Each structure stands twice: as C-alpha cells, then as structure tokens.
C-alpha cells in the first residue's frame, strides 16, 4: 500500500456504511489502517437509507442521527481502551461494549488515533458531526442555498 511508504498520502474510506457492521469491526479496521498508513487514515461513515438498512443489510431501523452518535462514541471508547488500557464500558441504547481481552487488543499505534468524518444531509446529522467527529462530508446535491437554508441554521 502506497500510504505505508509516505507521510504525504492520506487514506480514507469516503463513506462506509456504518450500521451494516459493528462499531467493534469499524474500530479494528480503522486501527489497522491507521497503523498501515503511518497515521494518515480517516474513517468516513454514513447511515444509509431505511430500505437499504432493513432490506439489504437486515439491520433494524432507528433514527440515524442518535444511532450514529452512539456509533462514533462506541468506536472512540474502544480506541481509548486499546490506546490507554482503559476498561471498556460503553453503554448506549443501540450499542453496548464491556469486554476486551488482551488477545483481541491490537498492537499500539505510534501516534494519533484515526480521524472520523460522517456524511450529513440534514441538521440532526450535522449536529452529530459537529459534536462527535473530526469532519463532515456533504452530499453532492448540497447547493449553497441548501447549505445556507437547511444545514447551517
């Protein structure tokens, strides 16, 4: 992988569908990619629409913004466990994590944790991005007018 041989190349997922996989899986994948890219990995997450969430991925539907908030918080709790040897104890409505054994703790990172960005179209997900994430990715249809009238207020 080219990112392993330079510090100038950023590696990111763009928008990976979050709810189709456990936050534990996303945390582990991101940790490994952060190590492999010399600390230049950004995890991009999106919620996907109800039809795909339920019928394509067979995941129960719930309001995406509160669930995405928990998803990001759970990933950060898992990373904190691995980086700082903090006991894992994340208890949310959608995700609960309380078990981490040494056999499943990845090798340490030599630097910062990965960044997290989420896809957002409306105000609720923008609020999650502002409060929990390192960045936001807007949909291609987000015109300046939409940004001014819907997302920013």
Regions found by a protein language model. Give the residues of each.
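Active-site-adjacent structural elements that line small-molecule/cofactor binding pockets in enzymes
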Residues: 1-153
């Amino acid at each position: 992988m080219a990112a392993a041989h330079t510090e100038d190349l950023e590696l990111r997922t763009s928008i990976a569908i979050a709810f189709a996989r456990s936050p534990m899986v996303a945390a582990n994948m991101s940790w490994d990619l952060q190590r492999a890219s010399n600390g230049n990995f950004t995890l991009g997450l999106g919620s996907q629409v109800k039809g795909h969430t339920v019928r394509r991925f067979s995941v129960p539907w719930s309001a995406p913004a509160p669930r995405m908030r928990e998803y990001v918080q759970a990933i950060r709790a898992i990373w904190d466990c691995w980086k700082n040897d903090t006991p894992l104890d994340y208890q949310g409505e959608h995700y609960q994590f309380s078990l981490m054994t040494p056999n499943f703790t990845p090798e340490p990172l030599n630097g910062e944790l990965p960044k997290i960005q989420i896809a957002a179209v409306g105000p609720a997900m923008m609020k999650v991005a502002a409060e929990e994430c390192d960045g936001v990715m807007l949909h291609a249809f987000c015109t300046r007018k939409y940004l001014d009238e819907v997302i920013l207020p």
